[in-house]
Amino acid sequence: RFKKIRRLGALPGLTSKRPRSGNDLKNQLRSVKRSQYRIRLEEKQKLRFHYGLTERQLLKYVHIAGKVKGSTGQVLLQLLEMRLDNILFRLGMASTIPGARQLVNHRHILVNGRIVDIPSYRCKPQDIITTKDKQKSKALIQNYIASSTQPQEELPNHLTIDPFQYKGLVNQIRDSKWIGLKINELLVVEYYSRQT
């Protein structure tokens, strides 16, 4: 993880750690001119590691986004932002996306009153995300919310949370302008368009 954030910059979905800022020798050596291919590859890797996707999963999302009307890059980010594991992370119910994925896989999360154990489940507007009534599930979420470094005002406007009832609400489709990650999604689309 630390090698990834040193190379690609801050990846809040992967870890809460930040790369060290300093003018050490390594940073000076890295200022060598990068090729266009490498720039596109690094943007793709940033997106992949932030959301915790395999190469195959990301390629699938790029293909889906390409078939939808609108900017492929914007649609791609919207698809990734509306995944259940990412919504839990954005709500502050998990400290990282892999942590949110584990909550979903272990069947602690309900969407509209039904257990969902698929982290890639695509949330829709008006979906209500809650925990199971079991004490263990509530304790896990309570610990995450209590230790959350994300202040309430940083909650994206497409989400609402009630921390006392362990309940989140998806208000609308995510606006891809606010993803909390410095990324040029067009370079990711270009990377894949040149691969085929």
UniProtKB/Swiss-Prot annotation:
<comment type="function">
    <text>One of the primary rRNA binding proteins, it binds directly to 16S rRNA where it nucleates assembly of the body of the 30S subunit.</text>
</comment>
<dbReference type="Pfam" id="PF01479">
    <property type="entry name" value="S4"/>
</dbReference>
<dbReference type="GO" id="GO:0042274">
    <property type="term" value="P:ribosomal small subunit biogenesis"/>
</dbReference>
<dbReference type="InterPro" id="IPR018079">
    <property type="entry name" value="Ribosomal_uS4_CS"/>
</dbReference>
<dbReference type="InterPro" id="IPR036986">
    <property type="entry name" value="S4_RNA-bd_sf"/>
</dbReference>
<dbReference type="Pfam" id="PF00163">
    <property type="entry name" value="Ribosomal_S4"/>
</dbReference>
<dbReference type="GO" id="GO:0019843">
    <property type="term" value="F:rRNA binding"/>
</dbReference>
<dbReference type="InterPro" id="IPR005709">
    <property type="entry name" value="Ribosomal_uS4_bac-type"/>
</dbReference>
<dbReference type="GO" id="GO:0003735">
    <property type="term" value="F:structural constituent of ribosome"/>
</dbReference>
<dbReference type="GO" id="GO:0006412">
    <property type="term" value="P:translation"/>
</dbReference>
<keyword id="KW-0687">Ribonucleoprotein</keyword>
<dbReference type="GO" id="GO:0009507">
    <property type="term" value="C:chloroplast"/>
</dbReference>
<comment type="similarity">
    <text>Belongs to the universal ribosomal protein uS4 family.</text>
</comment>
<comment type="subunit">
    <text>Part of the 30S ribosomal subunit. Contacts protein S5. The interaction surface between S4 and S5 is involved in control of translational fidelity.</text>
</comment>
<keyword id="KW-0689">Ribosomal protein</keyword>
<dbReference type="InterPro" id="IPR002942">
    <property type="entry name" value="S4_RNA-bd"/>
</dbReference>
<dbReference type="InterPro" id="IPR022801">
    <property type="entry name" value="Ribosomal_uS4"/>
</dbReference>
<dbReference type="GO" id="GO:0015935">
    <property type="term" value="C:small ribosomal subunit"/>
</dbReference>
<comment type="function">
    <text>With S5 and S12 plays an important role in translational accuracy.</text>
</comment>
<feature type="domain" description="S4 RNA-binding">
    <location>
        <begin position="82"/>
        <end position="143"/>
    </location>
</feature>
<keyword id="KW-0934">Plastid</keyword>
<protein>
    <recommendedName>
        <fullName>Small ribosomal subunit protein uS4c</fullName>
    </recommendedName>
</protein>
<dbReference type="InterPro" id="IPR001912">
    <property type="entry name" value="Ribosomal_uS4_N"/>
</dbReference>
<keyword id="KW-0150">Chloroplast</keyword>
<keyword id="KW-0699">rRNA-binding</keyword>
<keyword id="KW-0694">RNA-binding</keyword>
